[in-house]
Amino acid sequence: MQNSQAFSDSLPKHIAIIMDGNGRWAKSKGKPRVFGHKKGVNAVRKTVAAASKLGIKAMTLFAFSSENWRRPEEEVGLLMELFITVLSSEVKKLHKNNLQLRVIGDTSRFSERLQKKIVEAENLTASNTGMVINIAANYGGKWDITEAAKALALKARNGEIRVEDINEQLITEHLTMADLPEVDLLIRTSGECRISNFMLWQMAYAEMYFTPEFWPEFDEDSLVEAVTWFINRERRFGCTGEQVKALMTAQ
């Protein structure tokens, strides 16, 4: 490592995480699935804090996919209540730490109460200049691309653009998170090795890190390990976890 600036520049700018394994972790403890989801919130706190210390620009957490509605009705209901509780209890802490919260996905299917909480949380943190935290809720990569295609088709029909004007850049500008760097590191917990319809366009060139840890077990050290792997894979710097941790106190 030539200098700390080169090291800092080698960090991922946008980390996406598929937080998998809450239910299996709970089952291994002889607990109901919702117990795992609640413990998963602690892992979110630790991971967000660690990423912010590192100076990561954006983090996107896959909280609830558009396919998750197929889960048992009771579990979905409990997840929605947990979402409301977390938004209510955590948003002031995020705001205090200058973090910006966004919820991406089709929120129209959520209850009015949850939609209101989302709007309040986004409005409170909208002017913050620290790390952007995207919560992907009722989100799917195919949905994201479809919505962009519909928006462009409408503009073409209205004469605002020509069909021949449509290119990759224009599509990118009509996706969610268009103002953020593309994902350069995807982390998925629980040992599963697939992307599950998550940010299909934005992860075109991402490095993908799969760990056997269940999400409730994921913590600061887990993130440091993933980031160290990314730096060594992407930049061939031969850095260590200790060097990554040192950055947390230097930011």
UniProtKB/Swiss-Prot annotation:
Entry EC number(s): 2.5.1.31
Cofactor binding note of this UniProt entry: Binds 2 magnesium ions per subunit.
GO MF annotation, one: ditrans,polycis-undecaprenyl-diphosphate synthase [(2E,6E)-farnesyl-diphosphate specific] activity
Keyword Transferase: yes
Catalytic activity: 8 isopentenyl diphosphate + (2E,6E)-farnesyl diphosphate = di-trans,octa-cis-undecaprenyl diphosphate + 8 diphosphate
Record-level GO cellular component terms: cytosol
Active-site feature positions: 20, 68 (proton acceptor)
Function: Catalyzes the sequential condensation of isopentenyl diphosphate (IPP) with (2E,6E)-farnesyl diphosphate (E,E-FPP) to yield (2Z,6Z,10Z,14Z,18Z,22Z,26Z,30Z,34E,38E)-undecaprenyl diphosphate (di-trans,octa-cis-UPP). UPP is the precursor of glycosyl carrier lipid in the biosynthesis of bacterial cell wall polysaccharide components such as peptidoglycan and lipopolysaccharide.
Protein name (database record): Ditrans,polycis-undecaprenyl-diphosphate synthase ((2E,6E)-farnesyl-diphosphate specific)
Chain's gene name: uppS
